[in-house]
Amino acid sequence: MTLAEEFRSRNFSIYGQWTGVLCIILCIALGIANIFSFAVLRIIFSVLCLYAMSGLILIFIEVPFLLRICPTSSKFDAFIRRFTTNWMRAAMYAIMSVVQWLSLLPGSGASSLIVAAVFLLIASIFYALAGLKSQEFVGSKTLGGQGLVQMIV
């Protein structure tokens, strides 16, 4: 399946996965941009956006090919493999979005981390729609889904 065929399939998990890739880029970029701030709360939320929750964890969840080529522990692999259903991914993205929405707390002030919160929420909605429509989770072959992983093994 080509990328265009994947988008025409109307499977919301594909939309969620590609929105997740956009979230990876946004979380890493905005996490780095907001870490250079004088507001302590904003620094904490930018670290959460960059390292602890969003950016680096999402890379391994949304690009399964990386689990094959990067040396990771078995505990980390087991943690990542928990997010194989649409509902688990929707819940994960919703939690990450709520954490970034909390960056609006009065001590932090408004920042560009809101963009990450919005896109994490959109990805959560896509995965929830896939779950509501009882669509199977389908990983994009471009990102290392079924086709690419089989070629490497």
Swiss-Prot record:
UniProtKB keywords: Glycoprotein, Golgi apparatus, Membrane, Transmembrane, Transmembrane helix
Transmembrane segments: 21-41, 43-63, 90-110, 112-132
One record GO biological process: vesicle-mediated transport
Keyword flag rRNA-binding: no
Compartments it resides in: Golgi apparatus membrane
Topology of the protein relative to the lipid bilayer: Multi-pass membrane protein
An annotated GO cellular component: Golgi membrane
Residue positions the entry lists as glycosylated: 11
Chief place of localization: Golgi
Pfam families, A to Z: Cg6151-P (PF10233)
Sequence similarity: Belongs to the TVP18 family.
Function recorded in the entry: Golgi membrane protein involved in vesicular trafficking.
The name this protein goes by in its record: Golgi apparatus membrane protein tvp18
Organism of provenance: Neosartorya fischeri (strain ATCC 1020 / DSM 3700 / CBS 544.65 / FGSC A1164 / JCM 1740 / NRRL 181 / WB 181) (Aspergillus fischerianus)
